[in-house]
Curated annotation (Swiss-Prot):
SUPFAM superfamilies in alphabetical order: Aquaporin-like
Function, as annotated: Mediates glycerol diffusion across the cytoplasmic membrane via a pore-type mechanism.
Naturally occurring in which organism (per UniProt): Mycoplasma pneumoniae (strain ATCC 29342 / M129 / Subtype 1) (Mycoplasmoides pneumoniae)
Family assignment from sequence similarity: Belongs to the MIP/aquaporin (TC 1.A.8) family.
PANTHER family membership: AQUAPORIN OR AQUAGLYCEROPORIN RELATED, AQUAPORIN-9
Residues passing through the membrane, by range: 13-33, 51-71, 104-124, 162-182, 195-215, 244-264
Species lineage: Bacteria, Bacillati, Mycoplasmatota, Mycoplasmoidales, Mycoplasmoidaceae
Protein name in UniProt: Probable glycerol uptake facilitator protein
Subcellular location: Cell membrane
Catalytic reaction equation(s): glycerol(in) = glycerol(out)
Pfam families assigned: MIP
GO molecular function terms attached to this record: glycerol channel activity
Protein backbone atom coordinates (compact mmCIF):
# COMPACT_ATOMS: atom_id res chain seq x y z
CA UNK A 1 0.00 0.00 0.00
CA UNK A 2 2.02 2.97 -1.27
CA UNK A 3 0.46 6.33 -0.42
CA UNK A 4 3.61 8.31 -1.18
CA UNK A 5 3.48 11.43 -3.29
CA UNK A 6 7.07 12.64 -2.90
CA UNK A 7 10.38 11.72 -1.29
CA UNK A 8 9.75 13.95 1.75
CA UNK A 9 7.24 11.38 3.03
CA UNK A 10 9.66 8.46 2.83
CA UNK A 11 11.32 8.79 6.27
CA UNK A 12 8.04 8.65 8.18
CA UNK A 13 6.76 5.77 6.06
CA UNK A 14 10.01 3.81 6.50
CA UNK A 15 10.03 4.53 10.22
CA UNK A 16 6.50 3.19 10.46
CA UNK A 17 7.53 -0.05 8.72
CA UNK A 18 10.52 -0.38 11.05
CA UNK A 19 8.46 0.00 14.23
CA UNK A 20 5.62 -2.14 12.94
CA UNK A 21 7.98 -5.02 12.16
CA UNK A 22 9.80 -4.50 15.46
CA UNK A 23 6.60 -5.00 17.44
CA UNK A 24 5.53 -7.88 15.19
CA UNK A 25 8.64 -9.87 16.09
CA UNK A 26 8.71 -8.72 19.70
CA UNK A 27 5.18 -10.03 20.21
CA UNK A 28 5.31 -13.11 17.97
CA UNK A 29 8.73 -14.51 18.84
CA UNK A 30 8.22 -13.38 22.42
CA UNK A 31 5.23 -15.71 22.62
CA UNK A 32 7.21 -18.49 20.94
CA UNK A 33 9.94 -18.10 23.54
CA UNK A 34 7.42 -18.46 26.37
CA UNK A 35 6.23 -21.76 24.91
CA UNK A 36 9.64 -23.23 24.07
CA UNK A 37 12.47 -22.06 26.32
CA UNK A 38 13.28 -24.01 29.48
CA UNK A 39 12.21 -22.64 32.86
CA UNK A 40 9.41 -20.60 31.27
CA UNK A 41 6.08 -20.97 33.09
CA UNK A 42 4.28 -21.59 29.78
CA UNK A 43 6.71 -24.30 28.62
CA UNK A 44 4.41 -27.16 29.64
CA UNK A 45 1.21 -25.60 28.34
CA UNK A 46 -1.06 -27.62 26.05
CA UNK A 47 -2.26 -26.69 22.56
CA UNK A 48 0.97 -24.92 21.65
CA UNK A 49 0.13 -24.64 17.95
CA UNK A 50 -3.19 -22.98 18.76
CA UNK A 51 -1.52 -20.64 21.23
CA UNK A 52 1.20 -19.73 18.73
CA UNK A 53 -1.37 -19.14 16.00
CA UNK A 54 -3.37 -16.67 18.08
CA UNK A 55 -0.19 -15.05 19.43
CA UNK A 56 1.14 -14.41 15.93
CA UNK A 57 -2.25 -13.15 14.81
CA UNK A 58 -2.27 -10.62 17.63
CA UNK A 59 1.36 -9.74 16.85
CA UNK A 60 0.34 -8.90 13.28
CA UNK A 61 -2.52 -6.74 14.55
CA UNK A 62 -0.19 -4.88 16.92
CA UNK A 63 2.41 -4.31 14.20
CA UNK A 64 -0.10 -3.05 11.64
CA UNK A 65 -1.86 -0.75 14.11
CA UNK A 66 1.39 0.81 15.29
CA UNK A 67 2.73 1.29 11.76
CA UNK A 68 -0.51 2.72 10.45
CA UNK A 69 -0.81 5.12 13.39
CA UNK A 70 2.53 6.64 12.37
CA UNK A 71 1.80 6.76 8.64
CA UNK A 72 -1.57 6.02 7.09
CA UNK A 73 -1.19 3.21 4.59
CA UNK A 74 1.91 1.76 6.26
CA UNK A 75 1.77 -1.62 7.92
CA UNK A 76 3.04 -4.03 5.28
CA UNK A 77 5.59 -5.25 7.88
CA UNK A 78 6.44 -7.98 5.37
CA UNK A 79 8.83 -7.72 2.38
CA UNK A 80 6.61 -10.07 0.38
CA UNK A 81 3.57 -7.83 0.82
CA UNK A 82 5.63 -4.75 -0.08
CA UNK A 83 6.98 -6.48 -3.19
CA UNK A 84 3.47 -7.49 -4.25
CA UNK A 85 2.31 -3.86 -4.14
CA UNK A 86 5.46 -2.71 -5.97
CA UNK A 87 5.14 -5.26 -8.78
CA UNK A 88 1.41 -4.77 -9.30
CA UNK A 89 1.77 -0.99 -9.05
CA UNK A 90 4.60 -0.82 -11.57
CA UNK A 91 2.66 -2.83 -14.14
CA UNK A 92 -0.50 -0.82 -13.50
CA UNK A 93 1.52 2.36 -14.02
CA UNK A 94 2.72 1.02 -17.37
CA UNK A 95 -0.74 -0.11 -18.47
CA UNK A 96 -2.87 2.66 -17.01
CA UNK A 97 -0.61 5.70 -16.46
CA UNK A 98 -3.50 8.10 -15.87
CA UNK A 99 -4.90 6.16 -12.92
CA UNK A 100 -1.82 5.82 -10.70
CA UNK A 101 -0.48 8.80 -8.78
CA UNK A 102 3.04 7.67 -7.89
CA UNK A 103 6.23 7.47 -9.91
CA UNK A 104 7.87 4.13 -10.58
CA UNK A 105 11.33 5.25 -9.34
CA UNK A 106 9.83 6.45 -6.04
CA UNK A 107 7.95 3.18 -5.72
CA UNK A 108 11.08 1.04 -6.00
CA UNK A 109 13.17 3.31 -3.78
CA UNK A 110 10.41 2.99 -1.20
CA UNK A 111 10.41 -0.79 -1.60
CA UNK A 112 14.16 -1.14 -1.02
CA UNK A 113 14.10 1.17 1.99
CA UNK A 114 11.06 -0.65 3.36
CA UNK A 115 12.92 -3.94 3.13
CA UNK A 116 15.87 -2.50 5.04
CA UNK A 117 13.53 -1.13 7.70
CA UNK A 118 11.59 -4.37 8.01
CA UNK A 119 14.71 -6.52 8.36
CA UNK A 120 16.28 -4.05 10.79
CA UNK A 121 13.13 -3.95 12.91
CA UNK A 122 12.96 -7.74 13.02
CA UNK A 123 16.62 -8.10 13.99
CA UNK A 124 16.49 -5.44 16.69
CA UNK A 125 13.38 -7.00 18.22
CA UNK A 126 15.01 -10.44 18.28
CA UNK A 127 18.17 -9.02 19.82
CA UNK A 128 16.06 -7.47 22.58
CA UNK A 129 14.26 -10.77 23.19
CA UNK A 130 17.59 -12.59 23.42
CA UNK A 131 18.76 -10.07 26.00
CA UNK A 132 15.59 -10.44 28.05
CA UNK A 133 15.48 -14.25 27.93
CA UNK A 134 19.20 -15.05 27.82
CA UNK A 135 19.19 -17.06 31.06
CA UNK A 136 16.48 -19.27 29.60
CA UNK A 137 18.32 -19.56 26.28
CA UNK A 138 21.43 -20.79 28.11
CA UNK A 139 19.43 -23.66 29.61
CA UNK A 140 17.72 -24.72 26.37
CA UNK A 141 19.08 -26.92 23.58
CA UNK A 142 20.18 -24.94 20.50
CA UNK A 143 17.59 -26.46 18.14
CA UNK A 144 14.75 -25.43 20.43
CA UNK A 145 16.28 -21.98 20.67
CA UNK A 146 16.37 -21.81 16.87
CA UNK A 147 12.60 -22.23 16.57
CA UNK A 148 12.09 -19.28 18.93
CA UNK A 149 13.89 -17.19 16.30
CA UNK A 150 12.77 -18.53 12.93
CA UNK A 151 10.97 -21.39 11.22
CA UNK A 152 12.12 -24.96 10.69
CA UNK A 153 10.38 -27.69 8.67
CA UNK A 154 9.10 -30.81 10.40
CA UNK A 155 10.45 -32.81 7.44
CA UNK A 156 13.08 -31.24 5.21
CA UNK A 157 11.92 -31.58 1.61
CA UNK A 158 12.77 -28.67 -0.66
CA UNK A 159 9.91 -28.94 -3.20
CA UNK A 160 7.20 -29.48 -0.59
CA UNK A 161 8.60 -26.96 1.89
CA UNK A 162 8.83 -24.36 -0.87
CA UNK A 163 5.33 -25.15 -2.11
CA UNK A 164 3.88 -24.92 1.40
CA UNK A 165 5.35 -21.46 1.99
CA UNK A 166 4.38 -20.36 -1.52
CA UNK A 167 0.75 -21.42 -1.05
CA UNK A 168 0.49 -19.92 2.44
CA UNK A 169 1.90 -16.58 1.26
CA UNK A 170 -0.42 -16.59 -1.74
CA UNK A 171 -3.41 -17.06 0.57
CA UNK A 172 -2.21 -14.18 2.75
CA UNK A 173 -1.74 -11.77 -0.16
CA UNK A 174 -4.96 -12.80 -1.88
CA UNK A 175 -6.87 -12.30 1.37
CA UNK A 176 -5.45 -8.82 1.83
CA UNK A 177 -6.30 -7.98 -1.77
CA UNK A 178 -9.88 -9.24 -1.52
CA UNK A 179 -10.43 -7.52 1.84
CA UNK A 180 -9.22 -4.25 0.36
CA UNK A 181 -11.69 -4.53 -2.50
CA UNK A 182 -14.54 -4.27 0.00
CA UNK A 183 -13.57 -0.72 0.92
CA UNK A 184 -16.40 0.75 -1.13
CA UNK A 185 -18.84 -1.31 0.93
CA UNK A 186 -17.56 0.18 4.18
CA UNK A 187 -15.53 -2.93 5.01
CA UNK A 188 -12.75 -0.48 5.83
CA UNK A 189 -14.63 0.56 8.97
CA UNK A 190 -13.16 -2.47 10.72
CA UNK A 191 -9.87 -1.67 12.48
CA UNK A 192 -6.89 -1.92 10.15
CA UNK A 193 -5.01 -5.13 10.86
CA UNK A 194 -8.00 -7.29 11.77
CA UNK A 195 -8.06 -9.12 8.43
CA UNK A 196 -4.33 -10.00 8.39
CA UNK A 197 -4.62 -11.00 12.05
CA UNK A 198 -7.34 -13.52 11.28
CA UNK A 199 -5.65 -14.76 8.10
CA UNK A 200 -2.28 -15.31 9.77
CA UNK A 201 -3.94 -17.11 12.68
CA UNK A 202 -5.71 -19.42 10.25
CA UNK A 203 -2.61 -20.01 8.13
CA UNK A 204 -0.55 -21.07 11.15
CA UNK A 205 -3.30 -23.48 12.17
CA UNK A 206 -3.35 -24.86 8.62
CA UNK A 207 0.36 -25.00 7.73
CA UNK A 208 2.32 -24.21 10.89
CA UNK A 209 3.00 -27.78 11.97
CA UNK A 210 4.69 -28.49 8.62
CA UNK A 211 7.00 -25.52 8.03
CA UNK A 212 6.25 -23.03 10.79
CA UNK A 213 4.52 -20.74 8.29
CA UNK A 214 7.08 -17.99 7.81
CA UNK A 215 5.18 -16.15 4.99
CA UNK A 216 7.45 -13.19 5.74
CA UNK A 217 11.16 -13.06 4.79
CA UNK A 218 11.96 -10.44 7.44
CA UNK A 219 10.23 -12.45 10.15
CA UNK A 220 12.39 -15.48 9.34
CA UNK A 221 15.76 -14.33 8.00
CA UNK A 222 16.25 -11.36 10.34
CA UNK A 223 15.93 -13.37 13.59
CA UNK A 224 17.82 -16.29 12.01
CA UNK A 225 20.80 -13.98 11.46
CA UNK A 226 20.56 -12.83 15.08
CA UNK A 227 20.60 -16.48 16.17
CA UNK A 228 23.63 -17.10 13.95
CA UNK A 229 25.50 -14.15 15.48
CA UNK A 230 24.56 -14.91 19.09
CA UNK A 231 27.01 -16.76 21.39
CA UNK A 232 24.86 -19.90 21.56
CA UNK A 233 26.76 -23.14 22.06
CA UNK A 234 26.51 -25.78 19.31
CA UNK A 235 24.16 -23.59 17.28
CA UNK A 236 23.00 -24.53 13.79
CA UNK A 237 20.99 -21.85 11.93
CA UNK A 238 19.96 -24.47 9.34
CA UNK A 239 21.24 -22.43 6.41
CA UNK A 240 20.32 -25.16 3.93
CA UNK A 241 16.67 -24.34 4.65
CA UNK A 242 17.01 -20.60 5.28
CA UNK A 243 16.50 -19.56 1.64
CA UNK A 244 13.05 -21.17 1.38
CA UNK A 245 11.20 -18.82 3.80
CA UNK A 246 12.69 -15.95 1.78
CA UNK A 247 12.40 -17.16 -1.81
CA UNK A 248 8.96 -18.80 -1.59
CA UNK A 249 7.08 -15.76 -0.21
CA UNK A 250 8.84 -13.39 -2.62
CA UNK A 251 8.07 -15.69 -5.56
CA UNK A 252 4.41 -15.75 -4.57
CA UNK A 253 4.31 -11.95 -4.33
CA UNK A 254 5.85 -11.48 -7.79
CA UNK A 255 3.54 -13.96 -9.50
CA UNK A 256 0.42 -12.61 -7.80
CA UNK A 257 1.54 -9.05 -8.46
CA UNK A 258 1.81 -9.72 -12.18
CA UNK A 259 -1.51 -11.57 -12.32
CA UNK A 260 -3.37 -8.89 -10.41
CA UNK A 261 -1.93 -6.04 -12.47
CA UNK A 262 -2.72 -7.70 -15.78
CA UNK A 263 -6.04 -9.40 -15.03
CA UNK A 264 -7.86 -7.40 -12.35
Amino acid sequence: MFNLSDFSELPRWIGAEFLGTFFLILSGNGAGSQLTLNKMFAKESKAKLLTAAFAWGIAVLVGVLIANSLFEGAGNINPAVSLFYAVSGTIQKALYPLHVNFSIPLLWVALLLAWVAQFAGAMLAQALLNFLFWKHIEQTDPQSVLVTHCTNPAIFNIPRNFATEFVATSVLIASLLVAGSFGANRFDQSPRGVVPMLVVTGLIMSFGAATGTAINPARDLGPRIVYWLSPIKNKDPNLKYSWIPVAAPLSASVILGVLVAVIV
